[in-house]
C-alpha cells in the first residue's frame, strides 16, 4: 500500500506525509552526532562550523524540502511525543487523538487538519 501511495504521489511537491515506523528520536540524534564526528575526524568539518544547519543536514529528515513538520499527529490517546522528532518538532503544532492508528479514518485526518487550521502559529514567539 505504501509503495503504491509513494508511486502515485512521486511528482507531488506541495505537501508531505511522513509515517514513522520503528523510529527512535534518540537513535536519530546519536546517528547525527556520529556523522558529524566522522566529518571532524576526516577533516571535512571543523568543530567551530557546527551549527543548526549542520545538525539538520545530518538528521533522517534532511532529504525533505522542509525538515520540521508543521503538524505532528499522535494517535492512541497518549499526550506525549516519546522522543519523536526531538529536534524537528520544536515549532510543530501537536495534535493528539484518542483513536488508534489501525482505526484511523479520513474523517479523523480532516478533523486533525481542521484543528491545525484553527491554531495561531507563533513559531517560538
Where are these regions (language model features)?
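Flexible, compositionally biased loop and terminal segments
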Residues: 1-125
